[in-house]
Every structure is written in structure tokens, then in C-alpha cells.
Amino acid sequence: MKIIVSILVLASLLLISSSLASATISDAFGSGAVAPAPQSKDGPALEKWCGQKCEGRCKEAGMKDRCLKYCGICCKDCQCVPSGTYGNKHECACYRDKLSSKGTPKCP
């Protein structure tokens, strides 16, 4: 009986470790990576890029105009926008760390 329990525990540990390893490998090869900003640091290319990224980020926002405004400000400063409509701020540290004067997150 002890042998069977030991084998089951060992098998479950192997499954868990292999799933963690595959998740780490997929993240390392850019499956959830943020697209880099254009080479031009200023001007219309950056504004167009930020506009497209912020449209995607704010498409489900309740106050879309406010979301687009603050996302645009953060994008121009940080030159990145996290993927998805919510969360994923770990992809862009500058975007994540920007705070309003009240100490709340500035970037949507």
C-alpha cells in the first residue's frame, strides 16, 4: 500500500513540475510578450502605435474616453502597453508603477 501511495505522489509531482516547466518555456519564447514600440521615440509613429494599442486595451472599458486618455499618456511615457483589456501589467513595469497624485494606479 505504501508503495502505491509513493508512486502516486511521485507521478503527481512529475506532472506538476513538467507543466510548470512548459509554462516557463512558453513565456520565455514570447507567447505573452508585449510588442515593442516603434524605433522612432517621438512623433506620429509612436502616436499611431499607442493609439492602436490603447484601442485594444480600452475596448471593454466603461469610460472609454478616460481610459484612452490615460492609456495614451502612459504609453507615450513608457513606450509600452500591456496586452489584453485588464491586468498583465507585469509586462510593462513603467506602466505598472505610474501613480496618480492620490497614489492610485494611473494607467488603465
Swiss-Prot record:
Keywords: Disulfide bond, Gibberellin signaling pathway, Secreted, Signal. Its main location: secreted. Residues 1-23 form the signal peptide. It is found in: Secreted. Pfam families: GASA. The keyword Secreted applies. GO terms for biological process: gibberellic acid mediated signaling pathway. Six disulfide bonds may be present. InterPro entries: GASA. GO terms for cellular component: extracellular region. The keyword Secreted applies. It comes from the Eukaryota. Belongs to the GASA family. Gibberellin-regulated protein that may function in hormonal controlled steps of development such as seed germination, flowering and seed maturation. This is Gibberellin-regulated protein 7.
